[in-house]
Amino acid sequence: NALKRGHVNSITVFSKCHHGWAYHPSEANEMHPGLKFDLLDAEIKAAHEIGVKTPVYLSAGFDEKIAHKHPEWLRRPKDDRIGWEYPGFHELCMNSPYLDYLIAQIEEVVRNYDCDGIFLDIVGVRTCWCQNCVKTLLDEGKDPYNDENACELGERVYLNYTRRVREAVDRI
């Protein structure tokens, strides 16, 4: 009733949070251990019953669960410090196998749910000095610690990310 009274026409519902948990049964991820039902499906159905659209949120750049399982997928600063000693979330590099993991989650949501869009957060052009980014630049004969080279690679990595997401959604 509150949504109708407030003339709300769209609400963002969660597939995956910054902690990395899915809010629905998932083969591409793990469902939140405290959840015993498909919260995403219930939210979408309830919203659609009253004419409210439901874009689905996936935290793309942050996934603490996978960051701890695969620290080699983390985005690294030039000094190569991960930053575990500081509170907060740790960003993942889209030039790592994490991108395949994320694409599988996006495909699963688009294929299995009547969503009205996808909201991917914490993404953009980034500089990174993880082993994948350093290797890419070295393989190209470039100095990986030259900021201009790192920025140019960051633009290519983001372009590849956007292309892969678009291709995944268009396939479904």
Regions found by a protein language model. Give the residues of each.
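Aromatic- and glycine-enriched glycan-recognition loops and surfaces
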Residues: 1-6, 27-50, 100, 104, ...
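Active-site neighborhood of glycoside hydrolase catalytic domains
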Residues: 91-172
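Short C-terminal domain-edge/linker segments immediately following a structured domain
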Residues: 17, 42-43, 85-89, 148-152
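Short, well-ordered coil/turn segments that N-cap beta-strands
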Residues: 7-9, 48-54, 114-116, 171-172
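Aromatic-lined carbohydrate-binding/catalytic grooves of carbohydrate-active enzymes
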Residues: 4-39, 62-79, 83-86, 127-128, ...
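Acidic side chains
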Residues: 1, 38-41, 63, 116, ...
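Hydrophobic faces of well-ordered beta-strands that scaffold small-molecule active sites
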Residues: 11-13, 54-58, 118-120
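Active-site-adjacent "subsite" loops/lids of carbohydrate-active enzymes
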Residues: 56-113, 163
